[in-house]
Amino acid sequence: MILTLGDSVTWGQGLLDEHKFDSIYSNGQLLPRIAHSGAVIGSEKDTSGQKVHPEIPVPYPSVWQQLQSVTDWNGINVVILNGGINDVSLTRILNPWTQVDQISQLTKQFCSGAMTALLEDLASRLKPSGRLLVVGYFPILSHLSSPANEKQPRLLMESHGVATSSVAMETTVDINAILPRIVENCLAFWTTANEGLKDAVDQANRSLSRAVCSFIDPGFTEANSLWAPDPLLWELTPELEAQDEVKSLRDHACQDAYGDLVHLPQWGEWYTCCRASVGHPNVRGAAKIADELKRAG
């Protein structure tokens, strides 16, 4: 049996079940998937009872809560997991006023420190032959990103709570001027996250005195980021709509969670929710990650 824990990447945001990388990798094996869009790594003391559709990005159940919800580990041979980006926060990463050093520091804290503790606990629950496959991250934006229009990156920022205009100052941010700073944040997160996850894997294996954990690099390059020459991520359409496979399903789930847009109960969350697939592996991207998982055995 293969168990999947983690955030939107391991959940397979925007993908039909047959296109999710854990489904491809499992090759028909029983596949409990507890991963959830928006999940933070959290801590072993998390007690949130928040429950919504896994396509809706919310912090809980955290990855710690996900693993603690499993009551029988006897039949689990492989655990696929990830975590860290939501602890760092996409709002920080996509904010041009966030310093690269801050992104790097927070990413190391969560992808290395917090993940190490999680892996050690998780490994203690597995049978001796069990394995943990830790999936890395990828560049959301890169130096090769060239949006079709400035509205696309503007909407990406706004949907994650980053202001692009000021009523008080009567100004609108020049997207072309600030995009390079956002790119640097995205690249800093990508490289530091994967270094941190590798370090967490190594530390956990050392403390366990056996090679239980493996790091799985998705193998994406800057050319595979949003609006790059060979994107392996879901993008926005020219009309600024999500382009994924389960948009209709997610739209209904978002409306159930946040209400009718006309009444504006939680407009920001609703808008983010409906476009939650943007920046996640598309069908080709998920297939590539599945290939990397298969190479790990």
Model regions: which residues?
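A short helix->loop->beta-strand "cap" motif at the edges of active sites that frequently abuts
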Residues: 126-131
